[in-house]
Design a protein with these regions (language model features):
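An acidic, low-aromatic, low-complexity terminal/linker signal
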Residues: 1-130
Length: 130
């Protein structure tokens, strides 16, 4: 699934997506985990917010951002993403290449025209980022 933060396109595996909903303001909390400084309510659940926009030094775009709920190995977490609706893409395994960037943990990337779209390594979010 391809989404954007600050106009930059990123991807996650659809199996790692738990849902998309309107963004609601999070509740700030103290945390020693880099880029997790708040929590968000979704129904009865209280989930950590991973601030990928701050990590990438970007700002979420749009007046009505979306909440991307992802399945992290330690439990679901959410991210605020641009208001542009995410798009599903089907890729052949051969289309996935090594991500050359060093700005985020990625399981690989794929080419879309001249753009290289990184595929986030969800399991590494919040654990190794400083």
């Amino acid at each position: 699934m391809v989404f954007s933060i600050g106009g930059r396109r990123l991807a996650v595996k659809t199996l790692e997506v738990a849902g998309i909903s309107p963004w609601k303001p999070p509740i700030p909390v103290g945390s020693r985990t880099p880029f997790i400084t708040s929590v968000a309510r979704q129904g009865q659940a209280v989930l950590p917010v991973f601030d990928l926009a701050s990590f990438l030094r970007l700002r979420v775009q749009g007046n009505h951002p979306l909440c991307l709920r992802i399945k992290h190995p330690l439990g679901d977490m959410v991210m605020c993403i641009d208001e542009e609706m995410p798009v599903l893409h089907t890729l052949e395994p051969a289309a996935i290449q090594v991500y050359r960037g060093k700005d985020m943990p990625a399981e690989g990337s794929y080419a879309n025209g001249l753009d290289e779209i990184p595929i986030l390594a969800i399991s590494q979010l919040g654990s190794c980022m400083k």
